[in-house]
Curated annotation (Swiss-Prot):
Site entry: Positions MEP for the nucleophilic attack: 157, 213
Pfam families: IspD
Pathway assignment: Isoprenoid biosynthesis; isopentenyl diphosphate biosynthesis via DXP pathway; isopentenyl diphosphate from 1-deoxy-D-xylulose 5-phosphate: step 2/6
Enzyme class, UniProt record, top EC level: transferase
Protein name: 2-C-methyl-D-erythritol 4-phosphate cytidylyltransferase
Superkingdom of origin organism: Bacteria
Sequence similarity: Belongs to the IspD/TarI cytidylyltransferase family. IspD subfamily.
Organism: Stenotrophomonas maltophilia (strain R551-3)
Length: 232
């Protein structure tokens, strides 16, 4: 079997768009916080060795876990942006994680990752020299808006995908890509964007639409419905 993989989970965001009194990754669903569901999904896979959870400097809600599902859970302090937090997590990984080893990055508030999706990503991504991301083809019709709010045109969607997580890259390549983007003053919105700036072409691995990010109260309601259906 290939070397075990660590996952970096950026959880330093405050979730301001959600409007809750605490970061959304700490909201309850089905008897435990969202972050617990996320760790369940990640650490259940036999290839995942442990998790580096990146938290905010004033995070009073972090439960203080040191292990989950019998695997180590480490923490470090993140930065002002997602990219800065991911970079901090990569730098804080144990020394046993070599520079050329693949590392996963997964959103803390994306708790409904399926074992099948994670397995496909690992299988495809580790066979590629660059890596891969989970993504979903765009199925809705896309409109381009003008400054006045009117429609300026309809965009072709045939080759458009929505980026999901996890995303899988080699530790040193992703660290360099994120660092160079920060030096250039470029705000990257996911890890693949940083790699693209390096001239790399990560693979797209189709993932389930159920692997959604909890961003609004409606998303939380949707996840609770999923949990209720799963419980029977």
């Amino acid at each position: 079997m290939s070397a075990a993989i660590w996952v970096v989970v950026p959880a330093a965001g405050r979730g301001a768009r959600f409007g809750a009194p605490m970061p959304k990754q700490y909201l309850q669903a089905g008897g435990q916080i969202l972050l617990a569901h996320t760790l369940d999904a990640l650490l259940a896979h036999p290839a995942v060795a442990g998790a580096m959870v990146v938290i905010g400097p004033d995070d009073a809600d972090w439960p203080g876990w040191s292990e989950w599902a019998g695997k180590p859970v480490l923490t470090c302090i993140g930065g002002a942006t997602r990219a800065a937090s991911v970079l901090a997590g990569l730098q804080a990984l144990p020394e046993t994680v070599r520079a050329d080893e693949f590392v996963l990055v997964h959103d803390a508030a994306r708790p409904n990752l399926s074992p099948a999706d994670l397995g496909r990503l690992l299988e495809v991504g580790r066979a590629d020299p660059v890596g891969a991301i989970l993504a979903a083809p765009v199925r809705d019709t896309l409109k381009r808006a003008g400054d006045d709010g009117g429609i300026d045109g309809t965009e072709p969607r045939e080759r458009l995908w929505r980026a999901l997580t996890p995303q899988l890259f080699r530790r040193h390549q992703l660290s360099r890509a994120l660092s160079e983007a920060a030096t250039a003053g470029v705000e990257v919105t996911d890890e693949a964007m940083a790699m693209e700036r390096q001239g790399q072409r990560p693979l797209l691995v189709e993932g389930s639409e159920d692997n959604f990010k909890v961003t609004t109260p409606a998303d939380l309601d949707r996840f609770e419905f999923v949990l209720s259906r799963r419980a029977g």
